Amino acid sequence: MLPKSVLIVAFLVASSSAQYGVTGMYENLPLESTTVEASGEGSGYNESNDDGFVTGADAVAIDTDCSTKEDGLYAIGGCSPQFLTCSGGIARIMDCPANLIYDQRIIACEYSYNVPECSGVPQDVSSTQAYYPATEETTPAENVTVPAETTVDPYAPVEVATTAAPSEDVPVETTASPYAPVEVETTTAPAEDVTVPEETTVAPYAPVEVYTTAAPANDEPVTRTLLDKTCNGKADGFYSFGQCSDHYIACSNGYTIPMQCPARLSFDEARVICDYTMNVPECQNGSGNYEGSAEETTTEASGELPYSNGYGYEETTTAAADVPSTEGYAPETTAEAWVAPYRLESTTAADVPTTTVGYAPEVIEETTTSEYVEETTTAADVSTTTTVEYVPEVTETTTAPYVEETTTAEYVEETTTAADVPTTTTVAYAPEVTETTTVPYIEETTTVEEATTAADVPTTTGYVPEVIETTTTPYVEETTTAEYVEETSTAADVPTTTTVAYAPEVTETTTVPYIEETTTVEEATTAADVPTTTGYVPEVIETTTTPYVEETTTVEETTTTTVAYAPEVVETTTTPYVEESTTTPYVEETTTALMFHPPQSKATKLPQIHHPASKEHLLSSHAHKTIETVSMDMNLSSSASRDSSSLQSKDDAQLLTKLRSATNRTSTKEATTRTQNMHAHYHRNH
């Protein structure tokens, strides 16, 4: 016996590590056997205690050293209710329940009369009791008829296949216990005409169905229809299919789960419990079809419980000859009084091994499909547009195709068409949106029918604050029809900047390609008729330069009207050299908006647009040079025009009118001469 201190230390180490993993413990286990002769002859020390265990000199010493052993189960005696388990080098001793004996062949606890090592009284093992599995051990059979047993440990699925051999009066015993794939060794003794109890033992909680079919003496197999022991078409619950058996099934969501009653109890489907066979209606008077063998008949005794086997019945077994077994068929068995609750598969043969196949009958891995499925939405080319009040940091690019646009408006908010002129637009609220619009080539035609009288000077009313807008128009034939139009312009390559009251990170850029603009002007201009600008034109100074135009101009006295309050607006009109006649085929005219403007106003030099190798380019350049030359020659007129920005009284306006009249009275011949000089000067420079 080991000292208690050693056992206490072993238990402390075991509890601290808690290593119960025994993966692979059923394969390639080392076989150990401690065989003790229990004859008791000559020892003088063998005594039996009240429990029937042997004490004295033949008691088995326990080897608890797991330092050199692999993880697994090991026998500690030839016939012992205890066994040793090794896990991570830690040894534990475990006891079999219910007076069972550990059988190292099947790695399970078994009745003593089924353990070859217990050919008598089981031995006593002095140790501290614990629970653990053990190893597999095989003891050679003596030269007597010994049942060939195959027992599988619980919780490892197996399928037992039995082979029929020639007819001999040698019973072969097969014990199947599912859920334990192990290698099973079969010991076969020479055939003798000795009747040996034939019994099948299944470890608790190991559902296995073994079918035995009695065949004729000529070994012809009998085919039976296999019962459909599945959950097809059955509601959730427990079913034994009307048979007297310790095996039943549980149905859950259409899945079949094999189950087994413990301790040789039978399943009562009506009460859904496991009970003694005598209390199960299916097992009474042969009403149930028990799946046992025809050669096993148990006579129920009327004595008090329990009987010698520990249950409420006694078993009497007789061996049958020449009965092959066919697995998987429902047997035809007639039970008298009581039928044992275990199916028996028997093979009558000499030297016939039993093969155990690692197969789990009716074991289904359960798969649960929940109603809630990951949702997949398939839309047929459906685009979703979400409108959000605040959409930060979104860049939108819009490309417009070629559009021929005609605009007619009575009162239109100003749109500016110019080359390289930025436009500023104020938006109430456009948060964090960058929009780029590319407009292709647009051909625009504007028709203007206008009668202008030089005597009438444009009248500016309203409040026009501090905005200077310069528009340069290349040589264009222009026709404009307007009643009251706030200026509409189309520009080539004009970026538009949008300023938003609350617009973080928003930039809107509009790129307009080259636009060929054709303007046809059919105009009879009378100086007295000048367009009057009314309304609210904020901060704009507009300077218009008109290239070569055929125009008839009647110059009369120019009237300048001063509005009570028109701050920071200067409109200047300069009339260049004019061929005066009833119809003048060739007129070079420069028109500059004349407006009253404070000294803060800045003059903006307009870019020149050149079209090489074109008549329009030459005429435009010629007109531009002509305007410059005429302005240089006519010092009085130019000075008066420049000084008109600072006129503040009626006398100054009258003086400006006289200067213009003097300029217009210049002779045609002198104007022609100056024009020729300007042409020559232009050709020299180009």
From Swiss-Prot:
Domain Chitin-binding type-2: 63-120, 228-285
Signal peptide: 1-18
GO CC term (a single one): extracellular region
Gene Ontology BP terms: embryo development ending in birth or egg hatching; mitotic cytokinesis
Annotated GO MF terms: chitin binding
Keyword annotations: Cell cycle, Cell division, Chitin-binding, Developmental protein, Disulfide bond, Glycoprotein, Proteoglycan, Repeat, Signal
Top-level taxonomic group: Eukaryota
Pfam families recorded: CBM_14 (PF01607)
InterPro entries (UniProt xref): Chitin-bd_dom, Chitin-bd_dom_sf, Chitin_bind-dev_reg
S-S pairs: 96-109, 261-274
Glycosylation sites: 46, 143, 285, 635, 664
Region (Disordered): 284-312, 658-686
Role noted for this protein: Required for polar body extrusion during cytokinesis in embryo development. Affects cortical granule size. Shown to have roles in meiotic chromosome segregation, osmotic barrier function and polarization in conjunction with cpg-2. Binds chitin.
Name of the protein in question: Chondroitin proteoglycan 1
Source organism: Caenorhabditis briggsae
High-level lineage: Eukaryota, Metazoa, Ecdysozoa, Nematoda, Chromadorea
Gene giving rise to this polypeptide: cpg-1
